[in-house]
Structures are given as C-alpha cells and as structure tokens.
C-alpha cells in the first residue's frame, strides 16, 4: 500500500474549517482505516473566478497519510539524531523545487517532466509551473538491469551490482543492457506523448532525469534516439549544493526548500 495518497480535486469555495471537515471525504475510496487515523493536508493550486471576479471553485492538491507513518519517520529521525520538521509527498517536494527554480531563472518553458529512474521502477512527474499535474509509474528500473547482468554473467545479484558499477566485461553496453535502456526510453516516450496528446495547448519538449539511474548516460541517449525530446539532468533545476551527485537528492532538496 502507498505511504501517502494524493489527488487533484476541485471544491466549491469554503473556509479553512469547512475544508478541514470536507477533505477526508475526497479520499473515501482510498482509505482502509478510520479517517481519525490519518493526517490530511492540501495546497491551493488555483482559484477559479466567475465573471464578477468572485471565487467559484478551488483547485487543490490534496494528500492523506496514516499518522503512524509520520510517527515512524519521526522515530527514525530521532534515532539518527535529527528532528522531523516537515513531511511532504514527493509531488509537493518537486513543486517546491520548481517554485525555487522559476524564481531564480525565470524560464520560458512552463511544462516540466521529472523522470526518477529508481531501483524498482521509473516514476514520472509532470508539472506545469510549480503545480503538479499527473504522474506515471513504469515497472522497469535498475534492478532489472542488475538481474539481467546476473543472468548473463552467472553471478548473484550482489556481484552483478558491482559488475554494473564497474562496467565489468562491458556489462553496461551488452546488447541486452542496451535493449533494456531502449525499453525504458519507449515507455517514457509513450507517457510524454500521451500527455501531449491530451494537453494540446501545452507541450513537453524536455525531460529531467534524477534518481540512481540518472548516472547511466545510456538511458538518456536511448530517450534521445526514440523521441524528439531534450534530456537534461535534474541538477539543472536545482541551486548549487556542492554535491557530486545532486540527482540523488532532488526530492530531499525540495523538502528543504519548502521547510
């Protein structure tokens, strides 16, 4: 089960107290326990106004998470000698990152697609300005590459990981590895094309790579081969942190900027 439920919803204008009361009902199809066991929060994305300039609808990014989830993170932080100050769903962390980026750089483009190439899969987050629009999950990740190397070279997955990191015997450029990169690229391209088809007034023309897989240049090369997309590192959206691998900390930096 997901640690946090998120959704974009529209509600009529109401007070903060009314919103606090009504927000749990927006998640009635997702929650598996009593609503008193959850924290609910929201961010206003847009106030829709009528002809007389009065607010007629509120577009919200809303989220819900079990209170025990927050307590688990609080306990983990305490054991490490830290104090939990802020907990954000990843969509909100990326939004905070883009809020800072837009303020600093005043970019021409308003549409962003962050592609987190992770261990178990790929997660794509599409935002317009600093407002989250949608996400897509792809069931291909670095674990698939490790397993492919493991099978081809006849070693266990732990050894295959070291072979991947060192490109032992050309593990990263083997035809099977290259085929996996192109499968990843094809799925990423399909998601971008689907978004562009359904949002013809906007157009995604570039993607920003983050996560552990962002260090694998062949993945970006494969995307460029199969799609008319500019592929950039997520570090281009981030302030200079002095990190040697900023693509690993994209969401963490978003949380820090929000805090």
Task: List each model region and its residues.
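Glycine-rich phosphate-binding/hydrolytic loop that grips phosphoryl groups
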Residues: 93-96, 214, 232-259
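Small-residue (GG/TT-enriched) beta-loop-alpha framework at ligand/catalytic clefts
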Residues: 22, 54-162
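A polyampholytic, Gly/Pro-enriched intrinsically disordered region
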Residues: 39, 105-114, 159-163, 245-259
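Helical mechanochemical/support elements of P-loop NTPase systems and associated helical scaffolds
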Residues: 19, 23, 69, 141, ...
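Glycine-rich phosphate-binding loops at beta-strand->alpha-helix junctions
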Residues: 202-229
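Active-site neighborhood for divalent-cation/phosphate handling
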Residues: 1-101, 206, 237-239, 248
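Adenine-nucleotide phosphate-binding core of ATP-dependent small-molecule kinases
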Residues: 91, 151, 159-205, 213
